[in-house]
Regions:
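Short Pro/Gly-enriched beta-strand edge/turn motifs at strand-loop
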Residues: 1-4, 96-99, 120
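Conserved beta-strand hairpin/beta-sheet module of binuclear metal-dependent hydrolase folds
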Residues: 2-46, 138-148
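Conserved Rossmann-like nucleotide-binding pocket used by diverse enzymes
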Residues: 6, 54, 125
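Short Gly/Pro-enriched turn/cap motifs at secondary-structure boundaries
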Residues: 8-9, 107-109, 128-130
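Active-site neighborhood of phospho(di)ester-bond hydrolases with catalytic His/Asp-centered motifs
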Residues: 29-30, 51-58, 78-81, 128-131, ...
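Active-site HxH/HxHxD metal-binding segment of metal-dependent hydrolases
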Residues: 34-117, 205
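Metallo-beta-lactamase
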Residues: 93-97, 123-206
Length: 206
């Protein structure tokens, strides 16, 4: 089943929030940051049916919009890796302690588990790559890889924050991400798209 991917650049750190929908009109919201009004407008305009919020990791700029989405679609589950849950609950760990209003989310979550997962009506492959954060996860749907801050065009995620480990991040990307088909479209948490093939050839970290 073909999917459509729409990117919204939102929040204080220009985070990429992704709206992914299939031909049936079901959709997933990846990494909602602050100011998701345009995402909600698109869901309404296209008559989409939200299935889940999926969080690649728990840093504040990737979670600030959870309440905004759930304010309209309270019934949908929130997925995150278990090792990231402490970041949802602790503004020191998620980085929002430096904001005027530190953010926490203490609602129910569902676990992202490495391997094949059915999320709503979507068949996904979850790839766990710690190093930017304790349980950072990339989620592959069709040819698209939603990887948060694990891998960027020409770079990798920083590793100087809570749970960071630069070598573990590099090793994980090399062993789990760069082995994907080279036409895989990498949808990162910031910046533009790239492909696995391009990163193999051009990323100075590999």
């Amino acid at each position: 089943m073909e999917i459509t991917v729409k990117k919204f650049v939102v929040g204080p750190l220009s985070t990429n929030t992704y709206l992914v929908h299939n031909e049936s009109g079901d959709c997933i919201v990846f990494d909602p940051s602050l100011g998701c009004g345009a995402v909600l407008d698109e869901i309404d305009k296209s008559k989409l049916v939200p299935q889940a919020i999926v969080l690649t990791h728990g840093h504040f700029d990737h979670i600030l919009g959870i309440d905004e989405i759930l304010g309209k679609y309270a019934q949908i589950p929130v997925y995150i890796h278990p090792d990231e849950k402490i970041m949802l609950e602790n503004p020191m760990y998620n980085g929002s302690i430096m904001m005027e209003s530190p953010f926490t989310y203490e609602g129910t979550t569902c676990d992202l588990v490495e391997g094949k997962m059915r999320i709503g009506s979507f068949d996904t492959d979850v790839i766990v790559v710690p190093g930017h954060s304790p349980g950072g996860s990339a989620v592959k749907i069709d040819k698209y890889l939603f990887c948060g801050d694990i891998l960027f065009a020409g770079s990798v995620g920083r590793s100087d924050l809570f749970g960071g480990d630069g070598q573990r991040l590099i090793d994980g990307i090399r062993e789990k991400i760069l082995v994907l088909p080279q036409n895989t479209v990498v949808c990162s948490g910031h910046g533009g798209r790239t492909t696995i093939g391009r990163e193999i050839k051009e990323n100075p970290y590999f």
